[in-house]
Amino acid sequence: MSQRDTGAHYENLARRHLERAGLVFQAANVAFRGGEIDLIMRDGDAWVFVEVRFRRNDLFGGAAASITPRKQQRLHLAAAVWLAQRGASFATTSCRFDVVAITGNQLEWLPNAFNTD
């Protein structure tokens, strides 16, 4: 399986998990200069920007540990652009950043994993 196929597989797993939890799928792999959002979901009236991370094992800290402050900043910027295209902003719209971390066969959903400050 190619790296792209692997990523798509785990993003689909994450999407199904979030949908079972009641979130509603909106978009996938939304790319902007400098960043990409893996999944965009709705949770009630809140936009949820989701980063999906997979690691085969936790030898180097696992999937969740791989989301650096720089990656968070890129996600924040991409989400800001996406919101602006819809006439919204962090100040006017309820939103959060979630992480779905998959390490080996274990999936962990981290709602509100980091903030938009």
Curated annotation (Swiss-Prot):
One of its GO terms (molecular function) is nucleic acid binding. Pfam families: UPF0102. Gene3D superfamilies: 3.40.1350.10. Transmembrane segments: none annotated. CDD domains: PoNe_Nuclease. It comes from the Bacteria. Belongs to the UPF0102 family. This is UPF0102 protein YPO3549/y0119/YP_3803.
